[in-house]
């Protein structure tokens, strides 16, 4: 038999069959919280193997252990190539990666709401068709109100979430699969059978049959001793959220602090969790022990106890956080001999009592500018908001939601003025397009900073024909049509200036003190003819008679609240008038108090019970007189003077 793995140290099980490929060399690396990679150099008697038959398929290696058991290295063929070969054998190169590596080949933009990070991670795995994972987590995790995967691979997304929460993973290998183990504490790890204790033998003692270590190296490095985090919660703006976590070390430079903002939390207990997680990740770099030898059964994620080392304090339990492997098998051309084989590993370890956390290394996505989105809400609603005036939106990039009240988190809306129970407010309505910015570019922290029109949500005035018009126009809700609106509009076209106010139903004006309406008289015109003067005089005579008979001589007090605030809007249409031409131009909306001082609007509070001062007048005004308007006050039962203006004409020389 020309090609057989029967006596080989490492056996290859590939999709092409058990005897098609044989291992010549293996170089592999695995690490807690990182993807493993095994580079294989393989040989085959077939020089024309179909590479696509390997690519993306599972492959495993079986390493012979003392006692006849086996340790497996299982993975997905991520890459394969063919070289020139050696002698009668064709040469192939294969890279094995975990199934998790396939998540580096897919990306998405997606929103998760009201879920814990472990649940988000497992949902991502399942949605992509993977089920070979195990939950060995022991700590509790907060529920994220809003979590966004934004323009990043699914691997980067789950990796940065795990790094933030202090979760890591490692792989348990079997013959037909490898299982990802989610971990966060010592209890997730174990010692492999036969490797609870591994001895150290120095190289001077020569070759030993038992698996052992022959090289040891320890290093310690100064690390920050504490970490403080801070953040802000708009629902509790006065609450101090700063937290601190520290790890004590017995050297002279152990107390240097770190501080960071934002900590990405709104509850202090969550901040304490994040501060502790981050300082523990930093402290995993404080002490590292590297052991080199032939310990074939130990890999990343395993526990073992070192024995027989001369420095006694180093004979302790370790957690393997990283491992490198090298296997070399000599070529042979018959099935009668196995050729020479060699296995060597180098383990990166920490004290088993030191909590392991992965150092953050995954890039966090940054939204590099504002975006637009569409306001959404429940079916049948036109306005959907909460007590803070927040709204929900559908992002144009989100292909998973249904454009309803569950499309996003509540988002605060920037207003022109925001005081304590005062300011301005306009709630974006369902269907309107808004501008969304992100605090520090974080896709998890959106805020609405503006609104824009589009081809469906069009401007209220036809443009560019009405470019001189500006103002505010609303829409009645629910069920309002274009004919149902309130509006304040200004027209700035030269010669056609206008302030237009439209109330769809009621217009109520409440005035606490004076309200003055002044009308500038028309520009000087030619003197009126005698006939027009006579007609004007007759008009004023009739007006005076009606007003004199209708007016009460003093201010009155109303006993009916209904005649107060809602009727303040009653307008006196009469304005002061200049009767004859040629007089100096002046404002004609003057009234006077009892003492003769000018007064605009209603009488003051001190004058409410006094007689209204009325100029003495005998008969109606004549041509050449200036007519002034006085007002009768209507006192109310509510605070604040509110006036129903009734014109009383007086004549002034």
Predicted regions and their residues:
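Short alpha-helix capping/helix-loop boundary micro-motifs
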Residues: 39-49, 283-294, 360, 417-423
